[in-house]
Structure formats: structure tokens, C-alpha cells
Amino acid sequence: LNKELLDICYKKHNKEIDLTWEQLAQQYGFSSGECLRSWFKRIRRENGEIGYKNKTRILHISDNHYPFNLPKEVFKNYVGKVDVLVFGGDEQDCQSVSRFKKKYRVPFVDEMIGTRQMIIDIIEYIKPKQVKLIAGNHNYRLINYFSEKVHEDLLNLMPETNLDFIIDLGFWKHDHQSKSKTFYEPLTKVFDGKIDIEYMKNWWCKIGNTIFAHPKAFKSGILATTEKAYTYFLQLGEKFDTLCLSHTHHQGFSRYGKVYMYESGCLCEEPSYASEGTMIRPQDKGFVYLVQDEQGNLIYDESKLICL
């Protein structure tokens, strides 16, 4: 840190000298006066002298795996303090169309009804301004199941994930015994005019300079899956300063170069069907709270990985 330059900047800030920022920038090797002012402003922020304007507060939650989900009260410290709520995939377990034992399964439509209500309850509890949802590997279980049972021509009648039904399309539950049916409105209509809710129809999305992702790939080892995702997004040419990953059910944090990397953990009890003698590493419960400045850059000191 150039103490002489910092002293000069404070004098300029306090109007004790007549030099312009542009003149100071040329004198001390900065590309422009604006670049020097940004440097000085960053130093003052780091010293706690000034705050940030127009901050964006993001709560990233994932892997609820309804009906094994944790109660919404785990978010009690963030009620009314969130601008963007990101559901990072696997809100529903979709166990009835999985490969696991049938004795643990519940009807798929009932599970989807419960997942829909869980999402509504969380949104109404936290009260965010916007909601974004990305798809996890369990969200694709429905189309994977049908692709094995149904002719490929008929698959064109089906959306790819359960979130298409819950968020955008709505769905019916038919009771063939009583010959009745109930329609469950899509959440875009439930929250119409109240909260901006969007299903991204992809396994990742970008908000500011942060990438949120739920890959299908898994690599054992601490933050190994996140490091693989980091390389993948660099190869895509994406520019980002933060990577927040779902899927692994584990938590971790690291900084690689100038990029902050988080694994968010999960928000569910471990399904009993998935742990019968597999000797898998115990899962980590938690979520991630991120704060960005007006340019979408991470404010690290105000962001955190929450462990439950």
C-alpha cells in the first residue's frame, strides 16, 4: 500500500489540495482519475469508513428433498432481509420415480403437492423481492423415468422437470375413485404482482458476478465438485468472482485466485432409503448468504456460509 499516495488522496478528498484526480492518476501511474478514485474508495471501504450503496442480498438454499426437508424456521434470521432468494435445485426428492426400494416411496403427485406448498411457505416466510430457481438432478427424475417407460414420441408432451409444473404450468391431481380432480396453480400465478418468480430452466444461473449451479456430476473430496465446476465455467468463458454450488450435500469454502467458492450443504434430513450400509460421508446442513455491491461484485465481509 502506497502510504504517500493514500495521504495525498485524503488531502484531495478533504479539499486540501487543488490537483485533479486525473493529474494525481498520471503522477502515480494510474490509467485514469476514475481508476484512482475507485482505488481510494475501496481502501476506505476496507477501513470501514464508508459503506456500500444499492447492495443486493442473496439467500441461496438447496437440496430440501421434500418430504425430508427441514422446517422453514431455519431461515428465521433472514426474514425480510433478502432481495433475491435462490432455490438451488432438488426441492423435491422424487423418490417414487427413483431406483430405491418401493417401501419408502410416496405417490409422486402427493410429493409434488407438498413440494409446491413448501416453496410457497418458504417464500411467504422470508419475503424476498425476487425468486430464482434452477434445476437439480432430482428435478430431472420425472423425465428420466418416462424416457424408460414411454415411447420417445410421447415424451414431447412432457416438460423436462417437476419445476415446470410447479412454477410455470400448474398441474391436476385426478382422483379416479371419486372421479374428481383438483388443479394446483403455478407459482407464477400465485405470486403474480407480488413477487417476481422465475424458473431458469437450466442447472445454473448467474446473478451479478456470482454463478449458482447444481451439476449432475459429483467428484469425491472436499470442494472437488466445485473445483470441477470452476474449470467448466472458465472454459465456457464466463466471468465471475463467486461460485456457489449445490448437489454435494456438503459444505466448504475456499478462494481460488480471485474467485470465492462455496458448497452450500443441504436442507434435509438424510433419507433412510439412501443410507442403508452405503457408508457415505455424513451430510452437512446449511445454506449461503451472499451480499453484492451495485456492480454485482461479492462483498466478502458481509457474506457467509451458514452451518446448521
Q: Where would I find each of the regions flagged by the language model?
A:
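Active-site-proximal loop/helix segment associated with metal-binding centers of metalloenzymes
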Residues: 149-227, 266
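Active-site neighborhood of phospho(di)ester-bond hydrolases with catalytic His/Asp-centered motifs
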Residues: 60-62, 84-90, 132-137, 212-215, ...
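Core catalytic region of metal-dependent phosphoesterases/phosphodiesterases
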Residues: 61, 66-178
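Short, solvent-exposed alpha-helical "recognition" segments
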Residues: 38-51
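Short, amphipathic alpha-helical "recognition" segments used to contact nucleic acids or chromatin
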Residues: 1-19
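Short, basic interhelical loop/turn and adjoining N-cap
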Residues: 22, 26-41
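Conserved beta-sheet core of the metallophosphoesterase superfamily
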Residues: 216-306
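Beta-strand-turn-beta hairpins that frame and shape the catalytic cleft
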Residues: 51-59, 204-211, 256-259
